[in-house]
Amino acid sequence: MMNYKEAREYIEQRPRYGGELGLDAIRILLEELDHPERSLSFIHIAGTNGKGSVLSHISTVLTYGGYRVGRYLSPTLYSYRERFQVNGSYISREDFVRLVCVLKEGVERMEAKGIQAPTPFELETVLCFLYFREQQCDYVVLECGLGGLHDATNVIPMENKKLAVLTSVSLDHTEYLGDTLEKITLQKAGIIGPGVPMVSAPQKEEVKKTLESYCKSHGFQWKAADLSEAEVISATLEKQCFRYDGQEFTIQLAGTAQIENAVTAYEALQMLIKHGLDLETSQIVEGMKKTQWNGRFTKISEHPIMIVDGAHNPDAAMKLRSSIEQYFAGRRLIYINGMFSDKDYETVARITAPLAEQIFTIAAPDNDRALPPERLADTIRQYNAHVTPCATIREAVCAAKQAAGDDGVILTFGSLSFIGELTAIAAEEESA
């Protein structure tokens, strides 16, 4: 029997990219393991931004409504095991190790037949099916890793898919999904199928037209959330209140994008009710009040105020800028910024950098896609001369706190990958 470290290494050391584009390897492994996915009911989420927030709202409400709910998500903030949850509790190390041993046996049978083994994400996806079947989940809410059509999560049989949800779509991962909004939308829409209702977040006009055409040509049922119908009552860093569809909502998630995510989740749950889910609208309102989702315009420190946000592409950067202007107009802003090299960091810098008084750049830890802080700083200098590369996250936090003083606001963004470490450092500093 492996230990936890060995089980993690077994998954992480598999080849990261399959051979031919497609889902053959994961389908063969599922066949080897008696198709655990066929015993489950899924709510499948694709999109560029907002997947995690919508997932969190839907799963929290379903749990509040008395259902046993599996969550499968990535990336994680605090623990690798965070990606496999039942009613908000992470998978245990013991269950993880035991199920990796099951995966390993299936992979070895594949390899003995000369069949290429699945990638790490495909293995994790199969593990989530095994775990949630064991846990007898009523619903599994899961988000795509990349795109939709060819994503490992799209092995779910359409008859097991109770709802498809499309969150905000914008340009990202263009080397894999296509270089236009139309191409990316069609990739994301690949999770929709016959008999599967779909709910979309409010979308850009080009995305909306592509979706309308795609769904009409295939005869798919869908509905879009309407952000213009949402009336914001109040917004602070602790909570936001708004009216929508005759209901008054309070959510704990700050930031202008979170109203959009909340109404998308609401419409998704209403669609499930329409198709037989036993849930009251009052339970949606109460459940959404309980939803927590860190790393999305989240305050992690009070003195000085420190906000963390996962914004890592131009669309998310525009929403981040909107939140900055709403919450911190006229305040001194200090940034800590780290990006991956395969992101459009130049456009993100153009959108965000002019608002800052000082910027400290960092590298995402333990990731070969991390953009060196010096290179990011060189790019940012086109839009703001006051930028300093830092060797470590701790160095950046200390420098940013000194620059912020008593009245400045520190804003950290660019990737979810370093938020866990940064949050821990900020908590240490706050209690020191």
Task: Kindly give the residue locations of the regions a language model identified.
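Beta-strand->loop->alpha-helix junctions that form or flank phosphate-binding loops
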Residues: 73, 201-202, 214-236, 252-256, ...
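Active-site-proximal loop/hinge segments that shape catalytic or ion-binding/gating pockets
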Residues: 415
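C-terminal helical cap/extension that packs against the catalytic core
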Residues: 204-223, 236-238, 305-306, 314, ...
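Nucleotide phosphate-binding/pyrophosphate-handling subdomain across enzymes
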Residues: 139-144, 151-165, 170-173, 183, ...
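Short functional linear segments
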Residues: 1-47, 53-67, 71-73, 108-116
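Short, high-confidence coil segments that cap the C-terminus of an alpha-helix
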Residues: 136-138, 330, 405-407
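Acidic, Mg2+-coordinating active-site environments of NTP-dependent enzymes
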Residues: 110-111, 135-143, 160-248, 262, ...
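ATP-dependent carboxylate-amine ligase catalytic core
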Residues: 30-31, 35-38, 64-159, 205-206
